[in-house]
């Protein structure tokens, strides 16, 4: 299991996704953490807009964040699969 998800990771997602132009929403406690709620959670939950350009930007942003995506995982993100769990990066993330 990756380290607990905290504000620094939320800010890093925000910054890297902005740099890649990814359209997304933080969901659940990860969103509250980014807004300053003083807590941690086990992972981040994000809703990513399901367009082809956004999906490709998401794959690149995740790799920049340090996620080691298999070809199958990258393909799931690119095709807009409804639920993708990633446990192969600096923290756990659900898309």
Task: Identify the function of each model-found stretch.
Residues 1-95:
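Compositionally biased terminal segments of proteins
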